[in-house]
Amino acid sequence: MKLISWNVNGLRAVVGKGFAEIFASLDADFFCLQETKMQAGQLDLEFEGYQSYWNFAEKKGYSGTAIYTKHTPLSVAYGIGVDEHDHEGRVITLEMPDFYLVTCYSLNSQDGLRRLDYRMTWEDDFRAYLLANKKKKPVIVCGD
């Protein structure tokens, strides 16, 4: 199994810089992207043999995650089930037969640590989400 994780810092920008060629050359089973900074319908980027799953932030040009996979998941979850966090498009979870694959774009505390309190709440809630899934089967986490 080959898994690639990449913070693209704006997917539309890297598409013009050879993204499709890099994607094809890596031939990964799972290709997890963070910080896509896109909204639904902004870019039609499909690859033969892959299914794609997207979690868009409500705020335009902000965060966002995606997973491309050659394997059909048993289920897909968007977010961690906490409304306070799930509007930012930060997490996608694929349930596979033997494991969960979680891609995450964790939030930044920002200049002057403006969001530090929120970041700490996020960390606690994300950890609880991972531990709850871990009770069912192994969890693979990627992202930043």
Regions found by a protein language model. Give the residues of each.
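Structured beta-strand-rich core segments of catalytic domains in phosphoester-bond hydrolases
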Residues: K37, L43-S109
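A long, amphipathic alpha-helix that forms part
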Residues: L116-K136
